[in-house]
From Swiss-Prot:
Positions with a binding annotation for Mn(2+) 1: 59-60
GO biological process: negative regulation of axon extension; positive regulation of synapse assembly; signal transduction
Name of the protein in its database record: Probable protein phosphatase 2C T23F11.1
Binding residues for Mn(2+) 2: 59, 228, 277
GO cellular component assignments: presynaptic active zone
Cofactor note: Binds 2 magnesium or manganese ions per subunit.
The entry's keywords: Hydrolase, Magnesium, Manganese, Metal-binding, Protein phosphatase
Catalyzed reactions per annotation: O-phospho-L-seryl-[protein] + H2O = L-seryl-[protein] + phosphate; O-phospho-L-threonyl-[protein] + H2O = L-threonyl-[protein] + phosphate
Pfam families in the cross-refs: PP2C
Catalytic activity, EC: 3.1.3.16
Length: 356
């Protein structure tokens, strides 16, 4: 855990925006940390593609320069890829992450900076959702009150991540990269990206994101993007339940985000650091071209928990993508398993109800 203050900074920076498709709120708070290192973005329409919305959370560490730079530039890099104009959003996101990382390595503003950042981005276009993630920030959607993950956390204790780390000359100790970094993918962190014989995707720490896709249905109610300052305190489902209850009361997303930060803030930092991190959350209410009252009414319905896989074995695209990722993890054997007691279930690559 980073250095903490004697009293938390509870002033929140909040914002809101809306159009016919989205009702959006955001809030961030420094909390107990000495500095605020997070950044976030919410764009209802991209300048180069008005039909495309872009939302992101960046959780910086070791400083704020890389997170702030990413918040300003990552969406521009994604849109600039030829794959974006061709409709290949997955590859556009992957290349956008890597190109931004390379740009920061040579930019005078960032090339000597020691900081890094997670990045979880959600791009929505014409009913299709693309979530790119590097690190341990997270995006979760609510589908009739059921939490559906759009990303999973990249931890050095995951076997596939550990294999890459070791192959590039690093090691995993106390569930940290080289005993230092608690996540295995990030933008920046250039001290971990110096293996000359490996491409960017195979460095000790890589900026290469996993991209999961989904298709919006009328049952999709909202998407929450947040840093681990939220997810370390509350599970995916607890966050969805919290937000849904407030929306059912016709609360605006900005105030819901602010209340969520307050809910997650620790009363002190004497009990392991949970609730003592910087906190950032972006709440994207999905209107589907209808009025906000329709969303509020949907959120007042009883939740329906279906599980991820249908009993007949049919899977939608997000289920297929997460299944592919889980298969890539070869059963998710753990490194340093004896040190895992502190990890929450939501830090696994996918929740237990993802059957493969």
């Amino acid at each position: 855990m980073g250095q903490t203050l004697s009293e938390p900074v509870t002033k929140k920076e909040s914002a809101s925006c809306a159009n016919e498709n989205y009702l959006v709120g955001s809030s961030c708070m420094q909390g107990w940390r000495v500095d605020m290192e997070d950044a976030h973005t919410h764009l209802l329409s991209l300048p180069d593609d008005p039909k495309c919305a872009f939302f992101a959370v960046y959780d910086g560490h070791g400083g704020s320069k890389v997170s702030q730079y990413s918040g300003i530039n990552l969406h521009k890099k994604v849109v600039a890829q030829k794959e974006f104009s061709e409709g290949n959003m997955k590859e556009a996101i992957e290349k956008g992450f890597l190109e931004l990382d390379q740009q920061m390595r040579v930019d005078e503003e960032t090339k000597d900076d020691v900081s890094g950042t997670t990045a979880v981005v959600v791009l929505i276009k014409e009913g299709d959702v693309y979530c790119g993630n590097a690190g341990d920030s997270r995006a979760v959607s609510s589908v009739v009150g059921e939490a559906r993950p759009l990303s999973f956390d990249h931890k050095p204790s995951h076997e596939t991540e550990a294999r890459r780390i070791i192959a590039a000359g690093g090691w995993v100790e106390f569930n940290r990269v080289n005993g230092n970094l608690a996540l295995s993918r990030a933008l920046g962190d250039f001290a971990f990206k110096n293996c000359d014989t490996k491409p960017a995707e195979e460095q000790i720490v890589t900026a290469f994101p996993d991209v999961i896709t989904d298709k919006l249905t009328p049952d999709h109610e909202f998407i929450v993007l947040a840093c681990d300052g939220i997810w370390d305190v509350m599970t995916n489902q607890e966050v969805v339940d919290f937000v849904r209850e407030k929306l059912a009361e016709k609360r605006d997303p900005q105030s819901i985000c602010e209340e969520l930060l307050t809910r997650c803030l620790a009363p002190d930092c004497q009990m392991g650091g949970l609730g003592c991190d910087n906190m950032t959350v972006v709440l994207v209410g999905l209107l589907h071209g209808q009025s906000p009252d329709t969303l509020f009414t949907k959120c007042a319905r009883p939740a329906v928990f279906t599980g991820v896989n249908n009993e007949d074995g049919d899977q939608n695209q997000i289920q297929q993508d997460i299944s592919r990722v889980i298969n890539n993890f070869d059963g998710e054997q753990r490194v340093n398993a004896a040190n895992q007691e502190e990890e929450e279930d939501d830090n696994e690559p996918a929740p237990a109800n993802f059957q493969v």
